[in-house]
């Protein structure tokens, strides 16, 4: 066998360097007169992605956008601890996870006062275990309890964000936060102020909105926290940003890089040195917005994309949610898959061996700059409206508007969710009880796939009820204007030459419902008041009970349900020439 020749540096000196103009001319020739704009991608964020990028695009762009060379990101599973729960089971699960690939733990505490910090310290020594805590109230008291365990120090962070979480009595909460910063100022491995940027991602905000709104929330703290008790520099040093992730791979990479760049810009405006900006930590968590209950194993692919984006974007810690968390309490299997995903990216894919893999990419550097500029514009608009929390109404309205647009795009097929509105599995057998899920208060109705899911689950229940010849009836609340989304999804399945018209309008602000009997299913609509009164009658709830929240699924005997639907004036929503059964069967792939 011949000896392997020695390696030598590659040289492409025989090839002429081509400019951007030369490449554009070549594209014009190859397209033979076709419009070059057809090669561009216009994203929902308003970014125009070009068919190619050249090194000339980097000229004039800010350099050194990534200021965190640390490649050893932390793998931090999340454990939710409910009300009046001491957290013993979650702590035991966390201790086991730390022996099986986890680097740290993140606890989301509904009731921080009930959480047993003494037991926590016994099982997970606080001075050596990296732990994050999310609390909504009582932050100072909680940190005092942690320190009272006798620990020599704390590693990790506290997420207490009264601005983003809309906590009442903001002035009192800010005072609490100042106390937390004071208590932990001598603990360099503990971040006392983690901003909940995931809130905006989990409600469908665009990447640009997320950047702008996070900066607006951060500015509120930089403006309102400094006092005689804590300095501006101490507030900045305590900062960490939690961000939510979605599967838009390159844009998520650009989002994290843009946030670091703009954080440096923001601190520079406050007169703080570059070193203060370099200390920023980013904790990235996979988002609920993109998760589905239909064909749920596709969630594994989504969170893989999201986690890779976080790592390549420079996150300091990542939390990967189990693929089944939307419809059930995660089990050992789903939790293990989620925990192992970052380990594979580190140990097998080797993503920890390069400090900034995105650096120098013509596309990613350009995209980072575009996102930073557009995100800064959103930030300035919020500040012009009074900043947060004054402008929270504007922020929530913009998030709602974008979410509705995405629901519309999903319904008409412009935005694809694999397994939900495209490439569905008509024979899918659910690993959960659809009736129980629809009745659950924990079923997240804010996600992108929810309108499609609730219809699919209600339809499956209807056909099951009919096949088993059950004599009970059900009304399922589908959401606001879901009938219109159903119509658009149905139209997409029909030949283009078929022209359809609605028999009844769907007035603004009405709720969409599915009325299912053993014989037929009917799409209907009702005002919120009509549905509320209807639900009280069916559930036998007194009118004077103030805190009643109508459930998504209501069942009763057929006669009672028919009388109530008629009594409260529900109106039928029909597609001319097709029954509701035809529409639902076609959408579910039965016809």
Where are these regions (language model features)?
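Catalytic alpha/beta active-site cores
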Residues: 2-248, 279, 311, 317, ...
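Intrinsic disorder at enzyme termini
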Residues: 5-18, 34-41, 47-63, 316, ...
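Short, hydrophobic/aliphatic alpha-helical segments
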Residues: 30-34, 297-306, 469-472
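Short, compositionally biased low-complexity segments
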Residues: 1-6, 348-352
């Amino acid at each position: 066998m011949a000896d392997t020749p020695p390696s030598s540096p590659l040289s492409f000196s025989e090839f002429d360097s081509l400019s951007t103009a030369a490449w554009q001319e070549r594209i014009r020739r190859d397209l033979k007169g076709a419009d070059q704009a057809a090669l561009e991608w216009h994203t929902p964020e308003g970014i125009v992605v070009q068919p190619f990028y050249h090194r000339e695009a980097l000229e004039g762009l800010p350099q050194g956008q990534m200021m965190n060379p640390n490649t050893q990101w932390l793998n931090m599973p999340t454990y939710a601890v409910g009300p009046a729960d001491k957290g013993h089971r979650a702590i035991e699960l966390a201790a086991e996870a730390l022996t099986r690939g986890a680097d740290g733990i993140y606890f989301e505490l509904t009731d921080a006062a009930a959480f047993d910090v003494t037991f926590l310290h016994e099982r997970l020594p606080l001075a050596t275990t990296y732990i994050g805590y999310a609390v909504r109230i009582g932050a100072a008291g909680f940190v005092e309890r942690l320190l009272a365990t006798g620990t020599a120090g704390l590693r990790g962070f506290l997420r207490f964000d009264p601005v983003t979480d809309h906590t009442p009595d903001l002035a009192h909460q800010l005072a609490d936060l100042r106390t937390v910063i004071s208590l932990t100022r001598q603990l360099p491995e503990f971040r006392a102020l983690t901003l909940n940027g995931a809130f905006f991602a989990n409600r469908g905000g665009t990447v640009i909105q997320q950047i702008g709104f996070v900066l607006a929330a951060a500015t509120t703290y930089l403006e309102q926290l400094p006092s005689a008790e804590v300095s501006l520099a101490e507030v900045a040093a305590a900062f960490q940003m939690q961000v939510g992730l979605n599967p838009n791979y390159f844009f998520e990479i650009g989002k994290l890089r843009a946030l670091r760049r703009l954080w440096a810009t923001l601190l520079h405006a406050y007169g703080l040195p570059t070193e203060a900006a370099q200390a920023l930590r980013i904790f990235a968590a996979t988002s609920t917005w993109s998760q589905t209950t239909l064909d749920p194993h596709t969630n594994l692919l989504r969170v893989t994309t999201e986690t890779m984006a976080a790592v390549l974007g420079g996150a300091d810690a990542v939390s990967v949610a189990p693929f089944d968390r939307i419809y059930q309490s995660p089990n050992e299997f789903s939790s293990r898959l989620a925990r192992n995903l970052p380990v594979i990216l580190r140990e097998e894919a080797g993503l920890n061996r390069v400090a900034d893999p995105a650096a120098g990419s013509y596309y990613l550097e350009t995209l980072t700059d575009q996102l930073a500029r557009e995100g800064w514009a959103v930030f300035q608009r919020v500040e012009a409206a009074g900043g947060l929390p004054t402008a929270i109404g504007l922020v929530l309205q913009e998030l709602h508007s974008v979410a509705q647009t995405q629901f519309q795009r999903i319904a008409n097929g412009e935005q694809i969710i694999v397994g939900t509105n495209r490439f569905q599995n008509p024979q899918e057998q659910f690993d959960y009880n659809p009736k129980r899920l629809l009745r659950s208060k924990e079923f997240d109705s804010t996600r992108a796939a929810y309108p499609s899911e609730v219809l699919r689950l209600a339809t499956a229940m209807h056909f099951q009820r009919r096949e088993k010849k059950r004599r009970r009836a059900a009304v399922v609340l589908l959401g606001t204007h879901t009938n219109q989304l159903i119509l658009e999804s149905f139209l997409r399945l029909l030949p283009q030459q078929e022209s359809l018209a609605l028999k009844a309008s769907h007035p603004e602000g009405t709720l969409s419902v599915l009325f299912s009997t053993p014989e037929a299913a009917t799409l209907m609509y009702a005002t919120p008041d009509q549905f509320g009164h209807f639900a009280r009658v069916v559930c036998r709830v007194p009118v004077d009970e103030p805190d009643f929240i109508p459930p998504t699924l209501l069942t009763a005997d057929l006669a009672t349900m028919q009388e109530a639907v008629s009594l409260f004036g529900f109106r039928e929503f029909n597609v001319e020439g097709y029954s509701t059964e035809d529409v639902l069967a076609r959408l579910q792939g039965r016809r």
